C-alpha cells in the first residue's frame, strides 16, 4: 500500500509540472504568470497555467475565436491577440475572464463581433479593436464593459452609429473612431457615454456637424473632426461641453463658415486647429480669452474689421500663426499680424440697455 502511494506521489510530481509547463517555442516568466508566444506558428490557443496573468499570442493564426477559448485561464489580466488573422469573435469567446483589464485585438481581419462577444469582461478597462474591418456595433455589444475607459475603433469600416451602440459603457472616457466610413451619428447614439473626455472622429465622411448626437456629451475636453467634408459649424455646436472643451481640431475639412453663435458657452478653449480650409472670417464670439495656440494657414482670410479680435490676440502673443490676407486686393499676401488693414479697427461698442428691445 505504501509503495502504491509512493508511486502515485512520484507520478503526480512528474505530471503536474508537465501540465503547467511553458508551451513549446514560447517564453515564460514569473512562475508562468507571463507567457509570451509571439510569432511561433500557433493555430490554436495553447494550454497555459491557470495562474497566467499576461498571455501574448501576437502574430499567430486564429481565424475564429470560438466560445470559451480562454476558460482555463481565469486569472488573465492582459491578453494580446494582435496580427492573428482573426475574422470572427464568437459570443462568449472571452467567457470566464472576469479579471481581464487589457484586451488587444488590433490589426486583424475582424468583420463580425457577435452580441455577447465580450460577456464576463466586467473589469475590462482598455479595449483595442483598431485596424480591423468592423462595419457595425450591434446594440448591447459593449453592455458587459461597465469599467471600460479607453476604446480604440479607429481604422475600421463603421458607416453609422445607431442608438444603443455604446449601451452599458457608461464610464467610457476616450473614444477613437478615426478613419472609418462614418456618414452619420444618429441622435441617441452617444447617450450612454455622456462622460467622454476625448473623442476622435477625424478622417470620416461626415458632411454635417452631428449636433443632436454630440449635444448629449457633457465633459468633452478634446474633439477631433479633421478631414471630414464639413462646410459649416452651426449655432451652439459645443455648448453642452463648452465649459470643458480645451482642444478642437477642424483642419482640412473644407470649412467655409461658423455660425455667429457656434462657440456659445465655450469658455476654456486653449488649442484650435483651422488650417487648410475655406474660411475668410471668424465669428465675433470666437473665444480668444484662454486661447494659447491657433493654426490658421491656407485659408482665404478677408482682412476686414471682423477680424479685429484675432488681431488683438495676435498682438498679445509672442508665437503667432503665420496666416495671410487674401482680400481686400490691396492687402493680399500680407500677414494678418502685420497688415495695416486692421490697425484702424475699433472695438465694438456695447449697446446700451436702454436701447435694447423690451
From Swiss-Prot:
Pfam families named among the record's database cross-references: LRR_8 (PF13855), LRRNT (PF01462)
Keyword annotations from UniProtKB, A to Z: Disulfide bond, Extracellular matrix, Glycoprotein, Leucine-rich repeat, Repeat, Secreted, Signal
Distribution of this protein across tissues and organs: Present in femoral head and rib cartilage, as well as in tendon. Detected in bone marrow.
The LRRNT domain, residue ranges: 21-50
Carbohydrate attachment residues: 143
SUPFAM superfamilies for this protein: L domain-like
Domain LRRCT: 299-347
Keyword set includes Disulfide bond: yes
Repeat positions for LRR: 51-72, 75-96, 99-120, 123-144, 147-168, 171-192, 195-216, 219-240, 244-265, 268-289
Record-level GO cellular component terms: extracellular matrix; extracellular space
Subcellular location: Secreted, Extracellular space, Extracellular matrix
InterPro entries: Cys-rich_flank_reg_C, Leu-rich_rpt, Leu-rich_rpt_typical-subtyp, LRR_dom_sf, LRRNT
GO-annotated biological processes: bone development; cartilage condensation; negative regulation of bone trabecula formation
Gene3D superfamilies: Ribonuclease Inhibitor
UniProt function note: Promotes attachment of chondrocytes, fibroblasts, and osteoblasts. This binding is mediated (at least for chondrocytes and fibroblasts) by the integrin alpha(2)beta(1). May play an important role in the regulation of chondrocyte growth and proliferation.
Stated name of the protein: Chondroadherin
Organism: Rattus norvegicus (Rat)
Species classification: Eukaryota, Metazoa, Chordata, Craniata, Vertebrata
